[in-house]
UniProtKB/Swiss-Prot annotation:
GO biological process: mitochondrial cytochrome c oxidase assembly
Entry keyword Lipid metabolism: no
Topology within the bilayer: Single-pass membrane protein
GO cellular component, one term: mitochondrial inner membrane
Transmembrane segments: 33-53
Compartments (UniProt record): Mitochondrion inner membrane
Family: Belongs to the COX16 family.
Species in which this protein is naturally found: Candida albicans (strain SC5314 / ATCC MYA-2876)
Keywords associated with the record: Membrane, Mitochondrion, Mitochondrion inner membrane, Transit peptide, Transmembrane, Transmembrane helix
Gene from which this protein is expressed: COX16
Protein name in the entry: Cytochrome c oxidase assembly protein COX16, mitochondrial
Keyword Ribonucleoprotein: no
Top-level division of the source organism's lineage: Eukaryota
Amino acid sequence: MSYSGNRVFRGKKEQEAYDKTLAGRYVKLVKKNHFLFFGLPFLVSIVAGSIYLQKFTSVKWEKYDEKYQQLGEEEMLNLIENKRTVDKKNDYYRLQGLLNDHTNQVADDYEIVRVQRRKEDEPVWDRQ
């Protein structure tokens, strides 16, 4: 058996012996119908591998979803250790500065007084 380029040269007896082997019969079938004996098994193996590996990829994405899942507002509040109860009315007054946290009383240390405008800043419809 000698090599000339990329083809193998076999003598008559060697070729007959090769044709009787599994590889020889397969090469002959591939030459007759290459899609049926080469392309189709390749595509089937790709699809079967995808279906077989689907379990592993689903586990991978489930772990990813567990790690990066969006938490709802109540779930976030449950994660906080030193949480206080939420009361809309008290929080509104506390944020406005009207309620002292330590005494829970309304602060009466100021009055709301309207600042006098300059004459030229008065609305036009009031001028006569």
